[in-house]
Amino acid sequence: VAHDRKFKNVQPKDXXKVPAIAVANPKEEVIVKNKDEKMADLRNVPKXDVIXK
């Protein structure tokens, strides 16, 4: 698989199959799943707070 080189420390047998995006950026996955709702929330929250979460 192409992204195996990117995540060398992630083994397929660990915790079953984990989506690459979840490994790379868990917060980003949440935004993608609930895009409209999360993007609306992000507009009302200072960027510093979003990064800190």
Swiss-Prot record:
Protein name per the record: Neuronal protein NP-190
GO cellular component: membrane
Keyword Mitochondrion: no
Keyword Membrane belongs to the record: yes
Entry comment describing in which tissues the protein is expressed: Mainly expressed in the fetal brain where it is specifically localized to the proximal axonal segments, cell bodies and growth cones. Lower level of expression was also detected in the fetal heart and the skeletal muscle. No expression in kidney, liver, lung or spleen.
Alphabetic keyword roster: Developmental protein, Membrane
Subcellular location as annotated: Membrane
Protein's job: Neuronal antigen that may play a role in brain development. May be involved in neurite formation or axonal guidance.
